[in-house]
């Protein structure tokens, strides 16, 4: 098919409203859904057909369909080409669903050249697997994407080789979901002399062979979802595998192998009391998490968590633009929404004080310039939260109720 493709990332530039195109496709996450719908409505009013896809339309297809000529539900490797063929033939359907037998083998390499590399910290990203074997109640992955998928290791290696880069980031949600696959992948990566980072679970510390292979393959940093220090909260969210893990041992094992940790924690579980913020920050400082991140529990639509809170009448708003992990969109069980918001902000600021950064990085003994730079970036974020997102909506909600 002879087609000109223009790719626009609204994270770095706004979409020109006078854009001239035969067909427009918009991919939306929940936090960007209102903006996506607004753009779709605008271009449709100009007579340009619009297709909506991505995780949010996959979670709430009927809602998305109100703003589109067609929607793509699920992954689009097979459905998008079929949609384009149908469009050219004048027979585009209203909905395209992911093939349950979708395979990630022999796919074309991503067109990274369509994005302006100067606007990104790195373009060196690759994906080996999709999905996750776990079913955490707050996570959209089981609801949106279904079964886990894998690219053949040979395809992943070929993609990396054609990028001609020595540093890269794996975007996989859980790179070790299939341990045998992960070991095969790490063995091949070791021959490429790379340095890489990625996402996984605390379960990586259960297997010394796997952890050693990751280190030898060039792993220098991993994002781990600790989520909570409370066994009750972990059970509540169906993350019981974390309950079998000694967090102190996880950090020690990774640091011993020169692997830095981006540790992610969530506030707002039903078992969380107002002292959860100080307890979590104390733990982060005690074990020297290299790059901590905090999020507010967010009940994304169509997840088990959303259905529970909806049934209990605890959803505070359906303004999807607030569903970004930094707004309070549900009524917490043991504190007010305002307390949850202010406690999260306090945790960010306390963790990223200069002395806190120095203590964590010096004691972890992983000396990487990128870690220091990332901590300074998060310090800026922590001290300017109100400019990064509209954090006063709970205050306005409180005033409206008065």
Where are these regions (language model features)?
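Acidic, low-complexity intrinsically disordered segments
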Residues: 1-167
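Structural recognition of alpha->loop->beta junctions
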Residues: 63-81, 213-223, 279-294
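Radical SAM [4Fe-4S] cluster-binding motif and immediate context
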Residues: 109-262, 267-269, 273-274, 278-282
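Radical SAM enzyme core and accessory elements
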Residues: 2-7, 22, 116-118, 304-306, ...
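Alpha-helical structural signal in soluble globular domains
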Residues: 1, 42, 46, 63, ...
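Structured beta->alpha junctions
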Residues: 28, 32, 56, 72, ...
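Structural detector of well-ordered beta-strand residues that form the stable sheet scaffold
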Residues: 51, 72, 95-96, 197-199, ...
């Amino acid at each position: 098919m002879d087609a000109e493709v223009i790719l626009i990332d609204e994270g770095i530039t706004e979409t020109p409203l006078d854009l001239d195109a035969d067909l427009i496709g918009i991919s939306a996450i929940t936090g960007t859904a209102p903006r996506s719908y607004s753009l779709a409505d605008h271009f449709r009013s100009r007579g340009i057909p619009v297709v909506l896809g991505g995780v949010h339309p996959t979670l709430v297809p009927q809602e998305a369909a109100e703003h589109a000529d067609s929607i793509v539900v699920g992954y689009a490797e097979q459905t998008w080409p079929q949609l384009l063929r149908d469009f050219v033939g004048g027979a585009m359907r209203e909905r395209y669903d992911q093939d349950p037998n979708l395979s990630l083998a022999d796919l074309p390499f991503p067109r990274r050249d369509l994005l302006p590399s100067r606007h990104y910290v790195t373009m060196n990203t690759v994906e080996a697997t999709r999905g996750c074997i776990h079913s955490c109640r707050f996570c959209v992955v089981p609801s949106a994407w279904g079964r886990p998928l894998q690219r053949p290791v040979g395809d992943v290696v070929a993609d990396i080789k054609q990028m001609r880069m020595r540093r890269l980031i794996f975007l996989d949600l859980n790179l070790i979901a299939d341990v045998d696959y992960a070991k095969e992948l790490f063995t091949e990566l070791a021959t490429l002399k790379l340095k890489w980072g990625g996402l996984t679970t605390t379960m990586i510390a259960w297997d010394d062979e796997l952890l050693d292979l990751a280190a030898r393959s060039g792993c220098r940093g991993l994002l781990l979802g600790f989520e909570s220090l409370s066994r009750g909260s972990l059970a509540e969210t169906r993350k019981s595998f974390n309950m079998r893990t000694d967090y102190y041992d996880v950090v020690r094992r990774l640091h011993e192998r020169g692997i830095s940790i981006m540790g992610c924690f969530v506030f707002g579980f039903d078992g969380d009391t107002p002292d959860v913020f100080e307890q979590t920050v104390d733990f982060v400082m005690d074990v020297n998490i290299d790059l901590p991140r905090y999020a507010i529990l967010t009940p994304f639509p169509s997840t088990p968590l959303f259905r529970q809170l909806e049934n209990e009448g605890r959803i505070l708003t359906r303004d999807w633009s607030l569903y970004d992990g930094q707004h309070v969109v549900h009524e917490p069980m043991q504190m007010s929404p305002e307390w949850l918001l202010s406690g999260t902000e306090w945790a960010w600021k306390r963790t990223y004080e200069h002395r806190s950064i120095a203590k964590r990085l010096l004691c972890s003994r992983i000396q990487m310039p990128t870690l220091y730079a990332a901590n300074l970036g998060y310090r800026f974020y922590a001290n300017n939260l109100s400019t990064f997102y509209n954090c006063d909506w709970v205050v306005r909600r409180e005033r409206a109720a008065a």
